[in-house]
Amino acid sequence: MNYTKQDPELWSAIEREEKRQQHNIELIASENIVSDSVRKAQGSVLTNKYAEGYPGKRYYGGCEFIDQVEQLAIDRAKAIFNAEYVNVQPHSGSQANAAAYAAFIKPGDKILGMDLNAGGHLTHGAKVSFSGTFYQSVSYGVDPQTEKLDYDEIRRIALKEQPQIIVAGASAYSRFIDWNKFREIADEVGAYLMVDMAHIAGLVAAGLHPSPVGIADVVTTTTHKTLRGPRGGMILSQEKYAKQLNFAVFPQNQGGPLEHVIAAKAVAFGEALQPEFKTYQKQVLKNAKAMAEVFENDTILHVVTGGTDNHLMTVDLTGTQLNGKEVQNLLDGVFITTNKEAIPEEKLSPFKTSGIRIGTPAITTRGFKEDDCREVANLIIRAIKNADNETVLEEIKRDVFKLTEKYPID
């Protein structure tokens, strides 16, 4: 069947997106480029199969091979993270978080999570999210001077608010997080500790960031981002919580699992168990540090916290005449993809923001090294300082094209 002739409108859009990915420098910290094997598994005949339940306990017949696939994903994830319990069925990180809350607390209970402006995620208690609608939510931020987590202040808030669950983890925080300090605070107030490691899961898998598994009561993650798998979620915990977590995923929050996506997760987990994966993650860190140094050394830009310990950074734009949305659009115009991001003590709306978030997982997958990343950072600075100079912007486009031609997506 010729799909392009059967549905040209759809396939034209897909082809244009493929070209965009090929010719743009992708710096969105939550995006990556999966292997052909991951894509093939996700596009397999497993998409045809319903499989409500869990391996060995399905509500439908004909699941014997589906069980093998899902068990492979579970076993590989357990091996990667040294986890007693793994659930690979969550459709997304948000679904994993919803299930984790449902397993440990009840509607109306209190969540203590990281404030959005400090780098937290919507599902950590933001009022516009289910986590701030079905539950009471309070937040902690970062120290205004250092822009880093202040564990004494988090403890003070926890003692005052007495939450039922404390959420550690972030979507835009560039420093190591001390899981043990969060554990101590949670124990002191009698709260469960939940860690959302969606952004850093690949670094944790490679042993390059401290692991929360075995410290937190429950750990959630996405399977894309640094883990370089398909878009999806996962929950890790202790065996003693298996029954309540399984129930919270199915039937409480989801129906049939996406077994074609779970197969792709199994592929990605297999890749993460290979020595090359650690080499890749080390380069992700080197590239991020190289970019952060360029931005921090510039006269009008500032990297929140002054640098990075992981794959991302938030660049503070308050020293420029542009906001985050304007810089995002400006960089889109020169084929560099970023996203607007709030900074600590943010004064602008979430639709404008005072910063941009930058990450290195996708460009590292393409093969970029430190010098390439320094060049990209300098191109970004040049674009910001020449936002109205079409001649300079055209030169930047040509330089971007040279880099993407040098490192094509396989």
Curated annotation (Swiss-Prot):
S-S bonds: none
Cofactors, names only: pyridoxal 5'-phosphate
Residues given in the record as (6S)-5,6,7,8-tetrahydrofolate binding sites: 116, 120-122, 349-351
EC class of the enzyme, as a word: transferase
Keywords linked to the UniProt accession: Amino-acid biosynthesis, Cytoplasm, One-carbon metabolism, Pyridoxal phosphate, Transferase
CDD domains: SHMT
GO terms (BP aspect): glycine biosynthetic process from serine; tetrahydrofolate interconversion
Quaternary structure, from the entry: Homodimer.
Family the UniProt entry places it in: Belongs to the SHMT family.
Protein's UniProt name: Serine hydroxymethyltransferase
Gene name tied to this protein: glyA
